[in-house]
Regions:
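Terminal low-complexity tails and localization/encapsulation signals of metabolic enzymes
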Residues: 1-17, 235, 251-252, 333-382
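Conserved Rossmann-fold dehydrogenase catalytic segment
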Residues: 141, 169-178, 200-216, 235-242, ...
Length: 385
């Protein structure tokens, strides 16, 4: 098996076995995180087909029948694959046999579907009371919408994210990646880790109910709090911020860049660097609440300043003044960014059969928490399960 990371990399979850019955992104993302932390993750897939995302291409890695979509590669590092038909009596028996030795099970079937096969949490926890069973669904195990299938795009719409994303007065927009799926995977992982820690004391597992809808509502963060506290009815503001000014995209002489002024000291330094210190002293703009109140007069003024210099010139000037700012890079530029390469966030191998990948973003004592196993071909690992 090809190595992606050093064998000495930390494996805090070594000895933990995970059955990953999930498909697509939210569940597999949680399984990959646990694998990166050292868990033994067994991906249970449909015979002959596998995870839906294996065919979500192009682009593809490999050729012919062995090719796999890049989408699948992003969420299945560190796993072994086994094909089981969970609707068959033999498949049900295999799952139950694996559950006896498992610590965690992750699934994202519709509510009640696995109960038809005796693979629901109560049934499997009778076989293994220590089992931590994580159910990931669109709307949760209970509630008036629990029966509905949930996809990231639909949840972004129904849970409020699209109402605050997009240009002011324009159409609602989804985010460029499936953030609701991804964050549900992260939240599910933290709940699983909490349950594993608790089990050290209680000796018992838990049934975790992870809902994309709940996660997306929680992710509204300050926008939800603004509505609950101030009844502000948050709306789309383009790249501006409802609570901070200036904190948005500005045009420059040769393009665009982000100016992210988070406090009054930074605003004062920005005005000084721009050659207009008197604006920072003006009571209409001196404090953030004043700038929020007067954004309609301030932002056009700053726009005129920003258009007088190139993006790189502003970057050099503001970096030296300790004013947060950034160029706007595309994904291709990010993949070759010197900082990304210096941090070891891009995994490559001298083996031409191994696809390039993005590493797990966490380090412990300077080492990446990244599994050494590449995403598996269908059924790779069955002999060792």
């Amino acid at each position: 098996m090809t190595v992606l990371s050093h064998a000495s990399a930390p494996k805090p979850l070594a000895g933990v076995r995970v059955l990953d019955l999930s498909r697509v992104l939210a569940g597999p993302w949680a399984g990959q995180m646990l694998a990166d932390y050292g868990a033994d993750v067994i991906k249970v897939e449909r015979p002959g087909v596998g995870d839906d995302t294996r065919t979500w291409g192009p682009p593809w890695w490999g050729e012919g029948e062995e090719r796999v979509a890049a989408y699948f590669l992003c969420a299945n590092r560190g796993k072994r694959s086994i094909a089981i038909d969970i609707a068959s009596s033999d498949g049900i028996a295999q799952i139950k046999q694996l559950v006896v030795e498992a610590d965690v099970l992750i699934e994202n079937y519709k509510v009640g579907q696995l109960a038809k096969y005796g693979l629901d949490a109560p049934s499997l926890q009778k076989l293994n009371p220590r089992l931590i069973y994580c159910s990931i669904t669109g709307y949760g195990q209970e509630g008036p919408l629990s029966h509905k299938a949930g996809y990231d795009f639909a949840i972004q719409a129904e849970a409020g994210l699209m109402s605050v994303t997009g240009e002011k007065g324009g159409e609602p927009q989804k985010v460029g990646v499936a953030v609701t799926d991804l964050m549900t995977g992260v939240y599910a992982t933290t709940a699983i880790l909490a349950a594993l820690y608790e089990r050290n004391t209680t000796g018992k597992g838990r049934h975790i109910d992870a809902s994309l809808f709940d996660v997306q509502v929680a992710m509204l963060a300050n926008q939800a709090s603004n509505e609950l506290v101030g009844h502000t009815h948050p709306t789309r503001m383009g790249n501006a911020h409802p609570n901070i000014v200036p904190y948005q995209v500005f045009p420059t002489r040769d393009g665009h860049m982000v100016l992210a002024v988070g406090n009054d000291g930074q605003f004062e330094r920005f005005c000084l660097a721009a050659g207009h210190p008197e604006i920072a002293a003006d009571p209409a703009y001196k404090t953030n609440p004043a700038r929020v109140k007067n954004r309609e007069t301030l932002v056009p003024m700053l726009t005129a300043w920003m258009m007088q210099r190139d993006t790189a010139e502003w970057g050099h000037l503001l970096d030296n003044a300790s004013v947060p700012c950034s160029p706007i890079l595309d994904v291709e530029q990010v993949m070759t960014h010197p900082h990304l390469l210096a941090r070891g966030m891009k995994l490559t191998s001298s083996d031409p059969a191994v696809p390039p990948m993005i590493a797990q973003p966490m380090l412990m004592d300077g080492q990446r928490l990244t599994s050494e196993l590449v995403p598996p071909a269908l059924e790779i690992g069955r002999a060792h399960v």
